[in-house]
C-alpha cells in the first residue's frame, strides 16, 4: 500500500532526527542560521509575548524565540515527530528554558483556542504538510488580531543559471550528502522532492493573503534559495 504524504514525512523525520541538525548545516552551508537570524530581526519579537513554533523539529527556532520573549513570555513548539521532539527537549533542558513547552501534535489541527499567540512561526516545515493552505489558515486562526504569521522555507530561485545549478544540487548532490553524513539517501531524496514542488515566493505570498493575512512581506535569501513570508492578522472590527 502506498504511503500518504503525511505518513511518509513522519517516517522520514523519525529516521533522520539524530542527524537532522548536522545535515541542515551541511545542506545549507550554514546559511540557515543567518536566514533565521534575519527573520527574527524583521519579526521584532517583543519581550513577554506568546509564540507558537509549528513543525518545530529539533527546536532551534523555538529556542531563538524563547530568547526573544524572555522569562516573562511563553513559547510552544509543536511537531508530529516524537524523535525530533526528543532531540529538541534535550536542548531545551540543557538551556533550562522554563518558558518553553514542547508538544506532540499535528500542524493540520492545532490544539489551541483562536487568537492565542502574538507570533506563529513555521520553519522549513510548510513544504512537508499535506495541505499548505489548511496549515496557513490554522496558523492564522490561533494568532491574535494584529499578530504575525511567519514562514521561513526553501524557495525557487529565479536567476537564470543559478536556478539550474540549484535544481541539480537539490536533485543529485543533497541526497548524496544524506547518504554520506546520515546514511539516509532515500530520506534526503524526499526533502529534495518536497522542496522542488513547493510554491514560489509570489504564489506563497498570495496564499498568505488567501489565508486571511494582510501587509504580507517577502524577503528572499541567497538568490531565492530560501525566503521569509510574514503576514499580519487583521485587527478585529
From Swiss-Prot:
InterPro entries: MenG_heptapren, SAM-dependent_MTases_sf, UbiE/COQ5_MeTrFase, UbiE/COQ5_MeTrFase_CS
Enzyme Commission number(s): 2.1.1.163
Catalytic activity: a 2-demethylmenaquinol + S-adenosyl-L-methionine = a menaquinol + S-adenosyl-L-homocysteine + H(+)
GO MF term list: demethylmenaquinone methyltransferase activity; methyltransferase activity
Positions bound to S-adenosyl-L-methionine: 58, 79, 106-107
Biological or metabolic pathway of the protein: Quinol/quinone metabolism; menaquinone biosynthesis; menaquinol from 1,4-dihydroxy-2-naphthoate: step 2/2
Biological process per Gene Ontology, one example term: menaquinone biosynthetic process
Keywords carried by this UniProt record: Menaquinone biosynthesis, Methyltransferase, S-adenosyl-L-methionine, Transferase
EC class of the enzyme, as a word: transferase
Source domain of life: Bacteria
Function of the molecule: Methyltransferase required for the conversion of demethylmenaquinol (DMKH2) to menaquinol (MKH2).
PANTHER family to which the protein is assigned, alphabetical: 2-METHOXY-6-POLYPRENYL-1,4-BENZOQUINOL METHYLASE, MITOCHONDRIAL (PTHR43591:SF24), METHYLTRANSFERASE (PTHR43591)
Family, as annotated: Belongs to the class I-like SAM-binding methyltransferase superfamily. MenG/UbiE family.
HAMAP family the record matches: MenG_UbiE_methyltr
Protein's recorded name: Demethylmenaquinone methyltransferase
Organism of derivation: Bacillus cereus (strain ATCC 14579 / DSM 31 / CCUG 7414 / JCM 2152 / NBRC 15305 / NCIMB 9373 / NCTC 2599 / NRRL B-3711)
Name of encoding gene: menG
Amino acid at each position: 500500500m502506498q504511503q500518504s504524504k503525511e505518513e511518509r514525512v513522519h517516517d522520514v523525520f523519525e529516521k533522520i532526527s539524530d542527524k537532522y541538525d548536522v545535515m541542515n548545516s551541511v545542506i545549507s552551508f550554514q546559511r540557515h542560521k543567518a536566514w533565521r537570524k534575519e527573520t527574527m530581526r524583521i519579526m521584532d519579537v517583543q519581550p513577554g509575548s506568546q509564540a507558537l513554533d509549528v513543525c518545530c523539529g529539533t527546536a532551534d527556532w523555538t529556542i531563538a524565540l524563547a530568547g526573544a520573549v524572555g522569562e516573562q513570555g511563553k513559547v510552544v513548539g509543536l511537531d508530529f515527530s516524537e524523535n525530533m521532539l526528543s532531540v529538541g527537549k534535550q536542548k531545551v533542558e540543557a538551556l533550562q528554558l522554563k518558558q518553553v513547552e514542547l508538544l506532540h501534535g499535528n500542524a493540520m489541527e492545532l490544539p489551541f483556542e483562536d487568537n492565542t499567540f502574538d507570533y506563529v512561526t513555521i520553519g522549513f516545515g510548510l513544504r512537508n504538510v499535506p495541505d499548505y493552505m489548511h496549515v496557513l489558515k490554522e496558523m492564522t486562526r490561533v494568532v491574535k488580531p494584529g499578530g504575525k504569521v511567519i514562514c521561513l522555507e526553501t524557495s525557487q530561485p529565479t536567476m537564470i543559471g543559478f536556478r539550474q545549478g540549484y535544481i541539480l544540487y537539490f536533485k543529485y548532490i543533497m541526497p548524496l550528502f544524506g547518504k554520506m553524513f546520515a546514511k539516509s539517501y532515500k530520506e534526503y531524496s524526499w526533502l529534495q522532492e518536497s522542496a522542488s514542488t513547493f510554491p514560489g515566493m509570489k504564489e506563497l505570498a498570495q496564499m498568505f493573503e488567501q489565508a486571511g493575512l494582510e501587509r504580507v512581506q517577502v524577503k528572499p535569501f541567497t538568490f531565492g534559495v530560501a525566503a521569509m513570508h510574514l503576514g499580519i492578522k487583521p485587527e478585529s472590527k
